[in-house]
Amino acid sequence: EPGAWMSTNVYDGKLRRRIERNYRWSGSAWVQTNEVRFVYDGNVALQERNEFNVPSLTLTRGMDLSGSFQGAGGIGGLLALSDHKSRILDHSYFHADGNGNVTALADTNQNVVARYLYDPFGNPLSISGPKAALNRYRFSSKPVHELSGMYDYLFRWYTPELQRWDNRDPLNEVGGIN
């Protein structure tokens, strides 16, 4: 089918997504379009790397909504994003609301270069600005998967369009965390 896509993920022993591979259907076969590798500090991502393990994006984090560095899973703790993809390292700075949702990115000259507005369930109402697409860390400071629109909350995925998680609460399931 035209526009068909597929995504595969590789997880480590702590259930952190380490590699994301995206594919598009070419009409006769699946063709890999990109690969992202994640580097973590505890349970929060600090860096994204390409398939050659070269940094493409680095996140600077501070204290999250809990007042610690990872107590709220990093929600509201994003400070800066450094884009390594161009020849000149480009920095953007996060602005978030009281719930830890990223509402804007500013450049080093304090110009707003991206704005994000969400409904209460995380559906994007408005995404604007020249660098809006660069940032995948948005609702609840979590990364959104570009093809599915789902948010990675580490132990499970959230779909704002459906206003629900893709699986039951892992703590309430018998037989494991998935």
Briefly describe each language-model feature range:
Residues E1-G13:
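Surface-exposed extracellular loop regions of Gram-negative outer-membrane beta-barrel proteins
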Residues E1, I19-R21, E48, L81, ...:
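Beta-strand-dense domains in secreted/periplasmic systems and polymorphic toxin scaffolds
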Residues S28-Q32, W165:
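Tryptophan-centered short beta-strand motifs
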Residues Y23-W25, F52, T108-N111, L171-E173:
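Acidic glycine-/aspartate-rich tracts in secreted/extracellular proteins
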Residues V54-I75, L79-F155, E161:
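A motif-centric feature for acidic-aromatic and gly/ser/thr-rich catalytic loops and repeats
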Residues E20-G27, F155-P160:
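Short beta-strand segments and strand-loop junctions that repeat across beta-rich extracellular domains
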Residues G176-N178:
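Short beta-strand-alpha-helix junction that forms the catalytic/metal-binding core
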